[in-house]
Amino acid sequence: MKFTFIERNRHAHPVRVMCAVLDVSASGYYRWRGRPASPRQHEDRRLSIEIRSVFRASRETYGRPRVHRELRDRGIRCGPARVARLMRQDGLRAKKARRFRQTTRAASSRPTAPNVLNRVFTVTAPNTAWVGDITYLWTEAGWLYLAVVLDLYSRRVVGWATSERLTDSLAHAALQRALTERHVGTDLVHHTDQGSQYTSASYQRLLLAHRLTVSMSRKGNCWDNAVVESFFATLKVELGDRFPSRALAHDALFEYIEIFYNRSRMHSSIGFISPAEAEARFDNEAAA
């Protein structure tokens, strides 16, 4: 195991230093290295290359289950325990999301709505339930605020907007974008927290104009909107939350949301497929 680690890292660190740290002899390592590799070792080396390819493509965010699923989708047959072992040997560890942190603040003088969604985060079709919220990213020029609207069926980001200020128009822009790009009926449930951006007159008028069913979390209860909170935690781990400028942060968000997350990133809650694939499968089944 120690010699295997040295072999995998010999281009990154001096062999003699690693041998000293691991308390093995350099001569022993070179004798081990000179032996012909077994068929199993050859297979492990080829599989490790594929694993590293999947891991890099995921922005170093996939753990063993997602890596194993992606390998299977590529037609590579291997067991999950083997993937876990090779990832451990290569030091491949998925980034971990942090705890939720509340961004919006309730406006006590404005009317709110009941919690119609009531933590039912699994629905049977796209455009059945949307969830929205706001978070922020730090830049050297100041905060950049991000508002999103997610579809609960596919977990797709159907609308998003950014602003250097936390205003009512930010949330309004994200919802307007979602409504422009999606064809929705009057049976759509739209769920947010009780933040002032969501209880504002302009936002409520937009909901009313499209006859959406309004649902709001209980005051101060982030778990009532856990799906979008989880998305923000994932985004900040996979994308980062510190940028040189607001413009660069916005560009990074576009690439992450529109190119990676919506189209490629596997989501465990929808069977380890991407949001785009989840909706494509639904459309194909509906047309059959």
Describe each region flagged by the PLM.
Residues 1-288:
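Charged DNA-binding/catalytic regions of mobile-element recombinases
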